[in-house]
Amino acid sequence: INPLLIKLSVPMMVSMLVQALYNVVDMLVVGKIVGKTGLAAISNASMLCFIINSLCIGLTMGGSVLVAQCKGANDQTGQRDTIGMLFFLSLVGSAVVTILGLAIYEALFQALNVPANAYQDACGYMKIICCGTVFVFGYNAVCSILKGLGDSQTPLFFVGVATVLNVVLDVLLVGPLSMGTAGAAWATITAQGVSFMGSLVYLRRYQPGFSLRKIEFHREKLLAILKVGLPTAIQMVVVNTAYLLVTGMLNQFGTPVAAASGVGLKINTFAGMHCWAIGQAITAMVGQCLGAGQIERARKVVRSGLLLNLSVTAAVAVVVQLLAEPLICMFDGTSPEVIRCGVQYLRTCCS
């Protein structure tokens, strides 16, 4: 296994895990303070968040590939143009997702049979999250650029700071200020906004020639980003939409099952996070190899990445099987039905 691949993928994996903690922290705090009703609300809302994040990660991955190729070819102009178009795409994408999300989330929750006692909380949470979509797209754009340049540690720093802030705000807004699920949503988008602004300032210093005010439209760069990123985005959205439909069917069995499936899905997502991280590391390394014309080295990176991915997946599956019940109890240790259904869901999905 290529040591450089491990060095690049580990910070990416930790960064993605920490970034995913946004919703997990919301669920932990709300589950402990509000109870299973709030937990069911965020479990359903987080499914829409998964789809938004999938679209965002998929689209920005195209920018990461192009940035890596430009770096490998030492093409500073192409690199700058790609970064500009990636931000343009992120801005347009976030605007579309925000408008569409605000227009359909209520009808979607009704179609998903969200339990009546959790419906209003789910709507309130999702409304706030939709308004902060620009921060999600913006931060992932910066992360993709830095990863394409071979820097996987800086994104980890910024997402770590944001997660700590999210935890503090969650406890404060949901607890003493009694804002419920809405407080958890405000904590999340505030932390994401801080993460985006901080990483943007860093990128401006890291790339002296880059400025949001000097972005020029380059149709060929935009199409190149979409050519790589759009199929990935569609694939990820389709997978998460399938999970959304399953959640809708499970909601018919009541609040405990809805809460359990949401928790189980979140843990299952964490268990597979290394696959995305290693995939992004492979993308960055292969992009730079192809940009430099090193075809054989690119093939070796792919083989090493596949071996690493399979090895880690096997180890994670064993751990989840052994610790399924304690993991579910972290979110709600008071409801026997939530624990039973959650453990069954988790062990089935990770088998």
At which residue positions do the language-model features occur?
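Residue-level signature of transmembrane alpha-helical cores of multipass secondary-active transporters
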Residues: 8-16, 50, 90, 129, ...
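Signature of the first transmembrane helix
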Residues: 3-64, 68, 230-250
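Interhelical loop/hinge segments that connect adjacent transmembrane helices in multipass membrane
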Residues: 1-9, 188, 197-239
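Small-residue-rich hydrophobic transmembrane alpha-helices
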Residues: 39-99, 136-155, 260-324
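Short runs within selected transmembrane alpha-helices of multi-pass transporters and secretion channels
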Residues: 60, 129-147, 155-163, 184-197, ...
